[in-house]
Amino acid sequence: MDETLYIPPKPNSLPAVIALIRSLWKGDGNLLELLPAEAYHFDIGHLGRSRRGTVLFNRPSAVKEIMRDEQGVFPKSDLMVGALDPLIGESMFVTDGPKWRRQRTMIDPAFSLMRLSVAYVAMCAATDDHVSTISESADSGQPFSLDLAMSHLTADVICRTVFSTPLASNVAKEVFEDFTLFEKSVAQVDILGMILKPAWSEIKQTREVLAACERIRYHIGALVDTHLNVTEGKFNDIASAVIQAKDKDTGLPFTRDELIDQLGVFFLAGHETTASALTWVFYILAERPEWLARLREEIDPYMSDGDLSFEATKKLPLTRAFFKEALRLYPPITFVPRVALEKVEIEGKRLPRGALVMIAPWTLQRHSKYWEDPHAFKPERFLPENEKNLTQGAYIPFGQGPHLCVGAGFAQVESLLIMSQLVSKFDFELLPNQRVVPAARLTTRPAEQVMMRVRHRAQSNAAPTHLITSRQTV
């Protein structure tokens, strides 16, 4: 391996027993610390030491078969469904079979390309407001939490595009803190279930965690009620499209509780996963500022008065490659647990009924067989001329097949917009003496908040005025 390559933070691999004891003692629920070194090299292997230990599949063809699940043999595990139930109920994130198909069929039209182009105007408005806030930090020189800033920004984007309303900073902070508490609790349940207990373990959450879930659902319910209590046609957003959706067989819409489940998972998954990805993007830019010049060279010609048009998001191959490489190294959803409903064999591996099966974008996307310099940050691998040579099925940050994330296109456009806005305007600096380690809970975030300062970009590096285009407002 080239010694000059940049290797972003990753947990050290420890022997299984030591890693388990350490994780349970720390109580932070970091599943990445349980991965043995061989998990980045084997095709199929076990996590844990018991007969019922979790089976990890790293072979793309096996991953595809499990995720497509044409025979209905690998539903989402009760471990995951039970842990998430207090927050997202029976949303399509946890359902399977006919119920999932009904939900997906009703929801898909809300994320059509047409609606994405319409939503882009709201994305721009939210981003502009948060650029102003970050600019104030640059003026004062005060450090801020990168994680919290990205969570607030992406939550505001989701609120404006899904519900047509900005998100108050105090609500964003409360949701961030409550969700952090919730995902730490879920990760602890996952560790016990994956390593020590059968896959069908009963899931119990503490009163504190249940109260956090109730507060989050209260905020989402209030947003849903605002739409339900107005004249049809007042809003032209994702929430209104989902509210108006009808079951093709019964002609019935979603109930209020179903709307809170479905729109709640849009809000939570839609902003937390993107916030996770962008936190790593700007962490890496602070670590490797030479990339700022390269990205600015591509972004600047498409900026107009500090804005980026919707069409321009399709013309940023290097910026897109940078984002994709950050997603490869830090996939927002680190692990996807399934359970075998019956005895089954997958590519030579026999699984007993009840076996917990794990698909891990984290290990698949860092696997030594499919990636050159797998732990190194090399965005060039995702440039159009190189991407065609990548192993098919080894890159799944948004899932694949019928369960491909419904908001994948939304997240990519949003991220390119935010990257372009901030990269074109600011320089980034990490506060010294921070130990940044990724933690896998529900999303892949730094174990502790990352503190950062920003400075205004020097005017000499501003966009060439003769290359400026206008923002598309569609």
Region locations from a protein language model:
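Cytochrome P450 I-helix active-site segment
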Residues: 10-14, 120-124, 175-181, 232-240, ...
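Cytochrome P450 heme-thiolate monooxygenase catalytic core
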Residues: 1-11, 76-81, 115-276, 294
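Cytochrome P450 catalytic-core helices
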Residues: 273-292, 296-298, 409-424
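Conserved cytochrome P450 K-helix E-x-x-R motif and the immediately C-terminal K′/meander segment
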Residues: 22-42, 218, 222, 306-347
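Cytochrome P450 proximal C-terminal region
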Residues: 1, 7-8, 39, 127, ...
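Conserved cytochrome P450 K-helix/beta-meander segment immediately N-terminal to the heme-binding cysteine loop
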Residues: 359-387, 467
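N-terminal membrane-proximal hinge/A-helix region immediately C-terminal to the signal-anchor transmembrane segment
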Residues: 1-102, 122-129, 204, 212, ...
